[in-house]
A protein has these predicted regions:
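Active-site phosphate-binding strand-loop segment of PLP-dependent enzymes
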Residues: 1-45
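A generic structural signal for well-ordered alpha-helical segments
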Residues: 29, 154-155, 191-192
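Active-site PLP attachment segment
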Residues: 54-98
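A short glycine-threonine-serine/GTX helix/turn-capping micro-motif
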Residues: 105-118
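Conserved PLP-dependent catalytic core of the aminotransferase class-I/II
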Residues: 119-167, 171
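Conserved PLP-binding catalytic core of the aspartate aminotransferase-like
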Residues: 144, 148, 159-203, 207, ...
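PLP-dependent enzyme catalytic core of the Aspartate aminotransferase-like
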Residues: 193-194, 198, 209-251
Length: 251
């Protein structure tokens, strides 16, 4: 539309894990004078991300997923010109520029009103130090191998539908599945109670994505793999899924 000001996009879907063409969208935005805001909640810490190469004007991230930090942490990066244009959502005391009724005008204080979550920030710093030592490329290769292992194994489980791309190459380490013999919530509950396997079931705060994928209203069971998971754990999850998808009686 003619009045479009910005494009806001996920880097990868939190429902099906599909990686979106961020660099191509960034190039389109530059050609058409649009701002490009990229949400990297599912990719930060799990993929190499070059904000400048992608062409993003702003990049948001959460600390508790791929960055391995505590819950309640996160942040954003802004191109300097955009930072000067934006008005803070919240304003107030920061411990600096206390003489001003409007709060500080300089970065990062301008966007960090109030008392910061210092324990969370220190935890995130420790996690980032570990990530730097482990290497993002190595983490990506490990998670991709686990995802591929799961996809291959799940494809042969009866009464189970895989949602999303068939391969692991163009997706984050997120795989949703739908049992065809019962409600996904029953299987997810049994995975936790009987096998000690934690998954996320339902609509994942994205009902429209589930409508598009044909998994609304019951949703799907989402498996996610991280740097600490092992091939043996993937195999155990597959064995549990296989047993549950063959079950004929649910109480």
């Amino acid at each position: 539309r003619e009045n479009t000001r910005a494009v806001v996009m996920l880097h990868a879907s939190n429902v099906c894990g599909t990686l979106l063409p961020a660099a191509e969208v960034g190039a389109f935005c530059r050609e058409n004078g649009l701002l490009f805001l990229l949400d990297t909640a599912q990719t930060a810490g799990a993929f190499p991300i070059d904000m400048e190469a992608i062409g993003a004007d702003a990049l948001a991230f959460t600390g508790h997923k791929g960055l391995m930090g505590p819950q309640g942490t996160g942040g954003f990066l802004l191109r300097p010109e955009l930072a000067a244009e934006l008005e803070p959502l919240l304003s107030g005391g920061t411990g600096s520029a206390s003489h001003s009724e409007e709060g500080p005008s300089f970065l990062p204080d301008r966007f960090e009103a109030g008392t910061l979550n210092l324990p969370g920030i220190m935890g995130l710093h420790a996690a980032l130090t570990w990530l730097e030592e482990a290497g993002i490329d190595a983490i990506r290769a490990h998670e991709q191998a686990l995802t591929d292992r799961f996809l291959r194994g799940a494809a042969s489980i009866p009464n189970l539908r895989l949602v999303g791309l068939a391969g692991a190459e163009n997706r984050a380490a997120v795989v949703p599945v739908v049992p065809e013999n019962t409600d996904p919530a029953f299987v997810a509950d049994a995975l936790g109670r009987e096998f000690g396997i934690q998954v996320r079931v339902g609509l994942h705060c994205a009902p429209n994505a589930h409508r598009t994928l044909g998994t609304f209203p019951t949703g799907a069971i989402r498996f996610s793999f991280g740097p600490y998971n092992t091939p043996g754990q993937v195999d155990r999850a597959l064995e549990a899924l296989d047993a549950l998808c063959r079950r004929t009686v649910w109480l």
